[in-house]
Swiss-Prot record:
Pfam families: p450
Catalytic activity line of the entry: abieta-8,11,13-triene + reduced [NADPH--hemoprotein reductase] + O2 = ferruginol + oxidized [NADPH--hemoprotein reductase] + H2O + H(+); ferruginol + reduced [NADPH--hemoprotein reductase] + O2 = 11-hydroxyferruginol + oxidized [NADPH--hemoprotein reductase] + H2O + H(+); miltiradiene + 2 reduced [NADPH--hemoprotein reductase] + 2 O2 = 11-oxomiltiradiene + 2 oxidized [NADPH--hemoprotein reductase] + 3 H2O + 2 H(+)
Species classification: Eukaryota, Viridiplantae, Streptophyta, Embryophyta, Tracheophyta
Highest rank taxon of the organism: Eukaryota
The protein, known as: Ferruginol synthase 1
Summary of the tissues where the protein is detected: Expressed in leaf glandular trichomes.
Cofactor(s) the record lists: heme
Taxonomic source organism: Rosmarinus officinalis (Rosemary)
Length: 493
């Protein structure tokens, strides 16, 4: 009984918040009628990207949705995506920041969530001109080739023992090693080690917390109470990962101090140390460690998820697997590990990756954008402060764009010069414009080389052949992954 006045007051505040948020101009994009307080949240289901795709067929490519008190516009066509990300890219360059991202002050330092300004430009410049430049990628490819060799050796051991490989775990470890080699000239983890499991727990913990639906994001008045404990758990995971990254950085700074004449390593960590010591810009240690957090979490989670989807589609379509193996054999011959320089000679491999990204963009709604001012798009007003979600999943399965959109047909990309680098809005898994994913050059290489290494050297079969279509369920979150891990056995014919 004592709690009744508090609950009544809370209900009144929520209702008032909803009423105020709903009193908007009438020339908003069309959409389903929102219920009091909850808006359209009860309509979302477990797969919001699929729900939005269905609703957009009725309401159009610009659609209004109310997520609690958070007014949101869903974009579901390449034409409207181009308007948002290119034509009006500056207006829609803001970010809606989830409560979890406030952990350890990440929202104030992260390049992914900072407003477009001086700090953001400095960090973007480091990524574009130093970290992920073409020359940097070329200089570090020999390190990545070593890590691919380790993946091959692990798969060979499993093959000899008739042991199934959890593709998600193997892809995670390999992706983490490839990123660590590129960034730090080191191997972060070993297969089947305790360190591996700790890294996996932390990074998947961060990704799951950021991706979990949180009432405090839809009703900001609840944020101080953190009713689901999202912020508290995020502080723990973010803190653990930042401590590891800071350890890498501090160790290199100390090594530079004690051995000033030692040759520098050819990796991004040296660039970070140089940036801190020369102080050519206003970036501090925190900016760089939080940048590393973004790259490790975003890069490992999305690349891991996509590799698992690629392997699943190839297993479900054996004729595509055979075609890809034939191409790899013709180009690589007896070589075991693909060289990144061979990628232009492997058009079918490229088509397979594109087709998987079309069907299974790891982040189907991309990172949320926010309108920094009122803007009319396609005759509709998108008001200042509105959240904007680009439904890359819906665009990739649009019948008006793609023939047989639900089928895995890599051949469609052999005849079309469509790429996922941000200029073709039919295929935008990495986003586009000034907010395009900065790690795309590395992710592109990881997806192709890991897939090629697995397919070229082994034939594969499901650990449980009877578990096929029943395992197509997915889990929505930071990245949309398979609900049941893909476990497959490598073997030699």
């Amino acid at each position: 009984m004592d709690s009744f006045p508090l609950l009544a007051a809370l209900f009144f505040i929520l209702a008032a918040t909803w009423f105020i948020s709903f009193r908007r101009p009438r020339n908003l994009p069309p959409g389903p009628f929102p219920y009091p307080i909850v808006g359209n949240m009860l309509q979302l289901g477990t797969q919001p990207h699929e729900t939005f795709a269905k609703l957009s067929k009725k309401y159009g490519p610009l659609m209004s949705i109310h997520l609690g008190s958070l007014y949101t516009v869903i974009v579901s066509s390449p034409e409207m995506a181009k308007e948002i990300m290119h034509k009006y890219g500056q207006v829609f360059s803001g970010r809606t920041v989830a409560q979890a991202v406030h952990a350890c002050g990440h929202d104030k330092i992260s390049m992914g969530f900072l407003p477009v300004g001086g700090e953001w430009r400095d960090m973007r410049k480091i990524c574009k001109e130093q970290m992920f430049s073409h020359q940097s990628m070329e200089d570090s490819q020999w390190l990545r080739k070593q890590k691919l060799q380790q993946l091959l050796e692990y798969a060979q051991k499993c093959s000899e023992r008739g042991r199934a490989i959890d593709i998600r775990e193997a892809a995670f470890i390999t992706t983490l090693n490839l990123m660590s080699a590129t960034l730090f000239s080191m191997q972060a983890t070993e297969f089947d080690s305790k360190v591996t499991m700790e890294f996996k727990e932390i990074i998947e913990g961060v990704a799951s917390i950021v991706g979990v639906p949180n009432f405090a994001d839809y009703f900001p008045i609840l944020r101080p109470f953190d009713p689901q404990g999202v912020k508290r758990r995020a502080d723990v995971y973010f803190g653990r990962l930042l401590a590891i990254i800071e350890g890498f950085l501090n160790e290199r700074v100390e090594s530079r101090r004690t051995n000033p004449n030692a040759p520098k390593k050819d990796d991004f960590l040296e660039t970070l140390v140089d940036t801190l010591q020369t102080n050519d810009n206003k970036l501090k240690t925190d900016h760089l460690t939080h940048l590393m957090l973004d790259l490790f979490v975003g890069g490992s989670e999305t690349s891991t998820t996509e590799i698992e989807w690629i392997m699943w589609e190839l297993l479900a379509n054996p004729e595509k697997m055979a075609k890809m193996k034939a191409e790899l054999k013709s180009v690589m011959g007896e070589e075991k590990v693909v060289d990144e320089s061979q990628m232009p000679r492997l058009p079918y491999l490229q088509a397979v990756v594109k087709e998987s990204m079309r069907l299974h963009p790891p982040g189907p709604l991309l990172l949320p954008r926010k309108a920094e001012s009122d803007q009319v798009v396609n005759g509709y007003l998108i008001p200042k402060g509105a959240q904007v979600l680009i439904n890359a999943w819906a665009i990739g399965r649009d019948h008006s764009i793609w023939k047989n959109p639900d089928s895995f047909e890599p051949e469609r990309f052999l005849d079309q010069k469509i790429d996922f680098k941000g200029t073709d809005y039919e295929l935008i898994p990495f986003g586009s414009g000034r907010r395009v994913c900065p790690g795309m050059p590395l992710a592109n290489r990881i997806l192709h080389t890991v897939t090629a290494t697995l397919v070229h050297n082994f034939d594969w079969k499901l650990e449980r052949p009877e578990a096929s279509d029943a395992h197509r369920g997915v889990l929505f979150g930071f990245a949309v992954r398979r609900a049941v891990p893909l476990k497959i056995v490598p073997f030699k014919v």
